[in-house]
Amino acid sequence: MLVNVYVLVSVIFLINPLLGILLGASCCLDYKQSKYGIYLLIWMLAIYMAFINATKIPLSDMLEYQKVFFQAKEYGVVDYIQLNGKEPIFYALTYICYYLFWGNWDLYVMFLTLLYYLIINYSIVLFGKKCSCSSLSIVIALIVGAFFFQIFIMTGHLIRQCLAEAFFIYFLIRKFVIKRTSWWVAILALGMHSSVLPLIGISLLPQIKRSLTIKEFLKGVLLLVVLALVFFLLESVLSSVFFLAYLYSRVGSENLLGKDVWQTESGVGGLGILLGIVVVFMIFSIKRKMRLYDNGNIVNPLINNCLCLIFVLCILSICEITTLVYSYPIIGAL
């Protein structure tokens, strides 16, 4: 019976994607005992957003990605990665995709968008199930994640940063919720965009593993400031390291310290401040409501997010890292 329903929903999705997504969401609520409905919704949302992104006219950073994509036919894989000289995993993936999709740019964009939303959506479901969230809560979080404007606009503009963000959030979920430190996920995030390195560092702070108190929170912020100072003081030594060299160059560039028009028009700065307030409120609300339980599984990822937000909000002009902020409210929607 359920299989027939899912097949029907899938067919409707092919005819009318939005109606199919609506029916898929309804199936998740009606058939709570089945896990397949929620995974069907994950795929429908990801496929829908992938097709929309493929219709976008490449602008700004995407023009550069398009140029790099078509360069794959001119070089061998090693020369191609060395030519770009940064984020080897992303460019190795791009090289493979060029031949896998017969040099079709639209299919490449669809694949990267699909990959991004699948990782984000799967992370939401893992978090929701581990924390015993209701089916309604998980569905709402998935819908918010798919149709949140600032997230969507960046998936068609700063795709490397978005993929790094997705892998980073999945790393957080595995580390703090599933209790498995999957370094391979962190490496994938770094291989997509090195700007995620400070955020991975934040996730390793000892305060992240402890119950939230004002004292621990302030200690975490202070430690973060100290680490940032050490990072800049050791620039002459660390800038020779492959990954860190690019990160230092970005920190010192005008591109890092300026905002694009799309960021100003979409309210990136103001929304970042608002999200910071919301995340802080969520942390203390959850702590207050769950005093009788071991709330580390839920609170610790939010502590990490809050520290990341403080790091970003102190220097709102850092475009590369503000990109990573906007998926955090998805967890809060649960």
Language model feature labels by segment:
Residues 32-78:
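Extracytoplasmic loop-helix module adjacent to an early transmembrane segment
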Residues 58, 63-66, 72-75, 91, ...:
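Alpha-helical transmembrane segments and terminal signal-anchor/GPI-anchor hydrophobic tails
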Residues 63-70, 80-103:
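Short hydrophobic/aromatic helix or loop-helix immediately within or flanking a transmembrane segment
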Residues 111-131:
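Transmembrane-helix motifs of polytopic, lipid-linked glycan transferases
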Residues 124-147:
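Transmembrane-helix signature of polytopic, membrane-embedded enzymes
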Residues 153-169:
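Multi-pass, polyprenyl lipid-linked donor-dependent membrane glycosyltransferases
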Residues 168-181:
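Membrane-interface transmembrane helices that cradle and orient dolichyl/undecaprenyl
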Residues 181-204:
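Membrane-interface alpha helices of multi-pass inner-membrane proteins
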